A protein has these predicted regions:
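Short, conserved loop/helix-junction motifs that constitute active-site signature segments
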Residues: 43-45, 71, 96-99, 117
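Active-site neighborhood of phospho(di)ester-bond hydrolases with catalytic His/Asp-centered motifs
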Residues: 6-8, 28-33, 50-55, 78-80, ...
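An amphipathic, basic-hydrophobic alpha-helix
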Residues: 16, 88-93
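Non-DNA-binding regulatory cores of transcription-related proteins
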Residues: 91-98, 112
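Binuclear metal-dependent phosphoesterase catalytic core
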Residues: 71-72, 99, 123-163
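N-terminal active-site segment of His-dependent metallophosphoesterases
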Residues: 1-47, 57-68, 73, 135-138, ...
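Short active-site segment of divalent metal-dependent hydrolases/proteases
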Residues: 12, 36, 83, 111, ...
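Helix-adjacent hinge/juxtasegments
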Residues: 50-88, 100
Length: 163
């Protein structure tokens, strides 16, 4: 079994319960708008962290715009999503760009989305911080039970937290 924590749009602040959840996972994926690179130091997954540059991360030169992760049963494509529609990234455009992925992860909207209507799946963890989190910090957890069984769970945490 492999566990992947997925977050985005932290803007320098990550909810403490999300940090705990991420650090219990094998992999962590951050879909951009990190803003303060130092905030990533709190994320210590068991194996590896992957992060991409968001539209508010132009100053973070260590990150690329697109990443991918190969896991048993498929590939995960990761990008911030803002180049596929500024207000609401197009799932059709993302699927056309990454047709061979099993899952496409994007951020940008700060809204949690799990779109499994077509292949590849398109998911957005929502905002894991305080900025435009629509009432609560959010993230996703992907559990790979086997090559055929991938389970995505939405996670929602109380908005009241101090950093």
């Amino acid at each position: 079994m492999i566990e992947v924590g997925i977050l985005s749009d932290t803007h320098g602040v990550i909810h403490p319960e999300i940090i705990k959840l991420m650090n219990a996972c094998d992999f962590v994926i951050h879909a951009g708008d990190i803003v303060d690179e130092a905030s990533l130091k709190a994320l210590q997954p068991k194996q590896r962290m992957i992060a991409v540059k968001g539209n508010n991360d132009i100053h973070i030169n260590s990150l690329g715009e697109v990443e991918s992760l190969d896991l048993p049963g498929g590939n995960i494509a990761i990008e911030h999503g803002h180049l596929h529609g500024h207000i609401q990234p197009s799932h059709d455009s993302l699927r056309e760009t990454y047709p061979n992925a099993k899952v496409i992860i994007y951020g940008h909207t700060h809204k949690q989305v799990i779109d499994k209507d077509q292949s590849p799946w398109v998911i957005n963890p929502g905002s894991a911080g305080k900025t435009r989190n629509y009432g609560a910090a959010k993230c996703l957890k992907l559990t790979i039970k086997s090559e055929q069984e991938w389970v995505i769970e939405p996670k929602i945490f109380d908005d009241i937290f101090n950093i």
